Swiss-Prot record:
Pfam families: 7tm_1 (PF00001). Gene3D superfamilies: Rhodopsin 7-helix transmembrane proteins. It comes from Capra hircus (Goat). Residues 1-37, 94-118, 184-191, 267-279 are extracellular. Interacts with MGRN1, but does not undergo MGRN1-mediated ubiquitination; this interaction competes with GNAS-binding and thus inhibits agonist-induced cAMP production. Interacts with OPN3; the interaction results in a decrease in MC1R-mediated cAMP signaling and ultimately a decrease in melanin production in melanocytes. Belongs to the G-protein coupled receptor 1 family. GO terms for molecular function: melanocyte-stimulating hormone receptor activity. This is Melanocyte-stimulating hormone receptor. It is a multi-pass membrane protein. Receptor for MSH (alpha, beta and gamma) and ACTH. The activity of this receptor is mediated by G proteins which activate adenylate cyclase. Mediates melanogenesis, the production of eumelanin (black/brown) and phaeomelanin (red/yellow), via regulation of cAMP signaling in melanocytes. Keywords: Cell membrane, G-protein coupled receptor, Glycoprotein, Lipoprotein, Membrane, Palmitate, Receptor, Transducer, Transmembrane, Transmembrane helix. A lipid is attached at residue 315 (S-palmitoyl cysteine). It is found in: Cell membrane. The keyword Membrane applies.
Length: 317
């Protein structure tokens, strides 16, 4: 696939490729001598992918094993793990193929490599879209469980959750196919960036509102126990820290990649933007890191899931 940056990563359809409606190219010497390019070794990509692969396989296995975890909330977490699993599998497959090609162990025609490139691009794009969707679904699920606790089980039913999950997967696959097919059109990049901003805004609004409700609840308990200040401050700090971790990890891991896409549209020839384009592999590595962190934030904090995970590990040995 055409790409202006290094073809090292197979998400080449989005790697610094100026849209067809912007007939611009970025010459290598336009980036200037002061550019900082962070090189990501193949071994590091492979290691990150394998760690993420193991983590998310364990999450899926634990949720599948324990019937107590067969609820809408854990199904959303399981689907998030499956999305991250796609990122990991795509990365491991891509890196392994490239290492074999570079070593001369694997010899194949360019057309075959091109087809493999297309398949991996679709997998990665599908996993990114579905990951963002399931992160939003988890936020909505938690919001309903807090603000509509008495009606939660009538609102978030298993059939409804399955329909939402199916719709997300179908939409993710269709979106990825369209994105890869029409990758050189401005509207595709703008839609992807707009989708990221919408998910970020949704999560921020919901989690901030949940934090405000939690602090209000803590103040009520404090007044009853006549220890208003210590409880409220401690709970508020803990809630703020949790919120910072949730939104901070989301923004730090996904933000640079979507900034990259935005700059492709806004300034494809500017030297400063060219410096950012040169770090495309770093942005993909951050997304893989997000696939590693997601189980720690959303899955492994559950005592029931951790207990099941121990049973899964004991059975595997």
């Amino acid at each position: 696939m055409p790409a202006l940056g290094s073809p090292r990563r197979l998400l080449g359809s989005l790697n610094c490729t100026p849209p067809a409606t912007l007939p611009l190219t970025l010459a290598p010497n336009r980036t200037g001598p002061q550019c900082l390019e962070v090189s990501i070794p193949d071994g590091l990509f492979l290691s990150l992918g394998l760690v993420s692969l193991v983590e998310n396989v364990l999450v899926v296995a634990a949720i599948a094993k324990n019937r107590n975890l067969h609820s809408p909330m854990y199904y959303f977490i399981c689907c998030l793990a499956m999305s991250d699993l796609l990122v990991s599998v795509s990365n491991v497959l891509e890196t392994a193929v490239m290492l074999l090609l570079e070593a001369g162990v694997l010899a194949t025609r360019a057309a075959v490599v091109q087809q493999l490139d297309n398949v991996i691009d679709v997998l990665i794009c599908s996993s990114m879209v579905s990951s963002l969707c399931f992160l939003g679904a988890i936020a909505v699920d938690r919001y309903i469980s807090i603000f509509y606790a008495l009606r939660y089980h009538s609102v978030v039913t298993l059939p409804r959750a399955w329909r939402i999950i199916a719709a997300i997967w179908v939409a993710s696959i269709l979106t990825s196919v369209l994105s890869i097919t029409y990758y050189n059109h401005t509207v595709v990049l703008l839609c992807l960036v707009g989708f990221f901003i919408a998910m970020l805004a949704l999560m921020a609004v919901l989690y901030v509102h949940m934090l405000a409700r939690a602090c209000q609840h803590a103040r009520g308990i404090a007044r009853l126990q006549k220890r208003q200040r210590p409880i409220h401050q401690g709970f508020g700090l803990k809630g703020a820290a949790t919120l910072t971790i949730l939104l901070g990890v989301f923004f730090l891991c996904w933000g640079p990649f979507f900034l990259h896409l935005s700059l492709i549209v806004l300034c494809p020839q500017h030297p400063t933007c060219g410096c950012i384009f040169k770090n495309f592999n770093l942005f993909l590595a951050l997304i893989i890191c997000n696939a590693i962190v997601d189980p720690l934030i959303y899955a492994f904090r559950s005592q029931e899931l951790r207990k099941t995970l121990q049973e899964v590990l004991q059975c595997s040995w």
